[in-house]
Amino acid sequence: MEKFPQLKLVNACLIFILSMHLIVSSCAQKSFLSSKAAYLGQTSPGNTPKIFAPGMLADSGIVLGKVAFSGDGKSFYYSFARHWFDDNGSGTKEIRFDGKKWQKPNVIAEKITNPAFSPDETKLYLGAGGGQVWVLNKMGQGWSKPQFWLEKNYGLYNFQEANSGTFYLGSNGIQGSKSDWSTYDFCKMTIAGTDTIISSLGTAINTPAFDGDFFIAPDESYIIISAKETPTYESELWISFRKADESWSSPRSLGPKINDGLAHRFGQYVSPDGKYLFYTRGTGEQDCNIYWVRFDVLLNSLKKEMAD
């Protein structure tokens, strides 16, 4: 006779309930992200980039750098500043959807920027000066005050965590001095307690100049980099795919509609549903804006070209 059949039944019921909860939560997220209220209620772009939420984000100064949406699409984070290369007057803001409308922007951090979620969204990483990582910890429906999290004797720029727990960053941890931006490479880092191991992503995507502005896909299948950067910071957005041996393919351009003439392009980010690419574009501070463009179709076509 089977022992404790009731216990097996209870466990089966719990597993079923949890599975249904995950399915319902996933459907709810997808439902909101496809609703008219999603993305601050903005009309979705096609394959031609357009300014995201014009007039809604900057009350003074400029908006720039990486943005981040929560997985359910109901919280939006972005950076602001007075000038490109001055952290005075800079910081990070949050806009939340309250169930009926998007609330007004709220400052959640000062002088630290470039928000990036941990995979479980319990942490929001922010950077300062290219060499420090700060973190906000999830507390109920809000966030803790910024807490200092990591600093090394080398650069920790554009810090992002993939689903695997591997961190990606722009860094000169394998060469040069912390203040020498020309020695920064696209790198990955593993952290175990107080031990860190950092390595370059290789010569396929790195150059002898500064390499630090990027977006890594959560599953690490591709990386979007700011490439061909000039001494006056003009750059283009290119993509590289990770190979089976964990090396990277030769980068290729995201095309003339995104790389339309000389401009500084950085802060690249792909939305949680994979549909849209966000990035900052400007020829100077006077025309610096966050843009967005449909990305999933472009990504699929680039993958197909790589496979052919």
Predicted segments with their positions:
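Bacterial Sec-dependent N-terminal signal peptides
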Residues: 1-31
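Short, conserved micro-motifs composed of acidic
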Residues: 29-308
